[in-house]
Regions:
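Beta-sheet-dominated interaction scaffolds and their linkers
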Residues: 38-73, 77, 184-201
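Short, solvent-exposed loop/turn segments enriched in Ser/Thr/Gly
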Residues: 49-50, 60-66, 123-126, 138-144, ...
């Protein structure tokens, strides 16, 4: 059976890896060698230190940027160049649509040559042009641009499967016009995990969805508060959480050291800010009630146990007192009988 053509392989993708503005990637090429390469934003002379491209354009306007494709391999490589709609994954990382999925937005606005040949340990600076349609809606639009190599791998059934490995970066375009950033909180649910040690508090978990209801890219932060305890999100070790217009993302925040009090008042606050140009522009805070029921069973059981001990002690004391009074009465009666007997 003949090997698939590059076009056919692109349609038979079983997996595609994409690194955006990250460390150089390594992949097996169609040949025998290993290909290592990086792709970063550039100006006409070379890499310019940016992590990705941010641009603000009017409807109908065009702008040219550059990408630097650095071949770190020891042989010449022909890289396939492509642009596609961009999106944020559920974990907050940026990606772009795979080659076999058609773009519908900003990925269609970018024109770039189909391929570029780069010699060993050389860098090619390639221009690309973003042309905003006349009818583009105001606000933020995401795309990605990448250089890729195709390789072949054997599937479990022995068939040859094409794998595309891509390295690229974001191209974030803000179309001028009225910017209306906003966000909402939906589908809030809370749960509580008891500590069966009555002297230790439990922890609450608040799960919710943040929806970007405006037309601007948002950086989302916030906090959940329960019974006076607070937990912020994202955590200090987590990446920034960005939402494109129309995006929604599910979060779970854990609040530690919460005492059960039958009903625990809890509040959720989401404080988004506009990302990109105008970064830090405040947006109305979204607030939602997250109160939940938390019956203090360990404490109630402990109190019940203490109550039983106290009740048992009081009952024992009363019983002892009654027995003592009974014995004293018997002794008095015996004394009276002895006193009544003739001498």
């Amino acid at each position: 059976m003949a090997s698939p053509t590059p076009a056919a392989r692109a349609l038979l993708l079983a997996a595609a890896s994409l690194l955006l503005a990250a460390a150089p990637a390594t992949a097996q090429s169609d040949g025998e060698g290993t290909v290592t390469w990086s792709v970063r934003p550039a100006d006409a002379s070379g890499e310019d230190g940016r992590a990705w491209v941010e641009q603000e354009l009017d409807p109908g306007e065009a702008a040219t940027e550059y990408m630097a494709v650095h071949n770190l391999s020891d042989t010449e490589v022909v890289f396939r160049l492509s642009a596609a709609d961009g999106f944020f994954q559920d974990n907050g990382r940026f990606s772009m649509l795979p080659s076999d999925e058609p773009s519908t937005d900003a990925g269609l606005w970018i024109e770039v040559q189909e391929e570029v040949a780069v010699g060993p340990d050389e860098t090619a600076v390639v221009p690309f042009t973003t042309t905003v349609p006349d009818n583009a809606t105001p606000g933020d639009h995401a795309a990605g641009i990448a250089a890729s190599v195709l390789s072949e791998q054997a599937g479990e059934d022995g068939a040859t499967v094409g794998v595309e490995s891509r390295v690229g970066f974001r191209v974030m375009t803000r179309v001028t016009g009225a910017l209306a950033p906003s966000a909402s909180i939906e589908d809030v649910s809370s749960s509580y995990a008891l500590s069966w040690n009555p002297l230790a508090p439990g922890r609450a978990q608040v799960t919710f969805t943040v929806v970007n209801t405006g037309n601007a890219r948002l950086l989302v932060t916030g906090a959940a508060t329960a019974a006076g305890r607070e937990a912020a999100f994202p955590g200090p070790e987590e990446i920034d959480q960005e939402l494109m217009p129309g995006d929604e993302r599910r979060f779970t925040v854990t609040v530690d050291d919460v005492w059960p009090s039958v009903f625990v008042p809890a509040t959720l606050n989401v404080t988004p800010v506009v990302a990109g140009e105008g970064e830090g522009t405040p947006v109305d805070t979204a607030t939602a009630d997250a109160g939940f029921w938390a019956v203090p069973w360990p404490q109630l059981i402990a109190l019940a146990g203490i109550g039983l001990l106290i009740g048992s002690s009081l009952w024992g004391r009363r019983r002892s007192k009654a027995r003592l009074e009974h014995l004293l009465e018997e002794a008095r009666e015996e004394g009276r009988r002895e006193a009544a007997e003739p001498v």
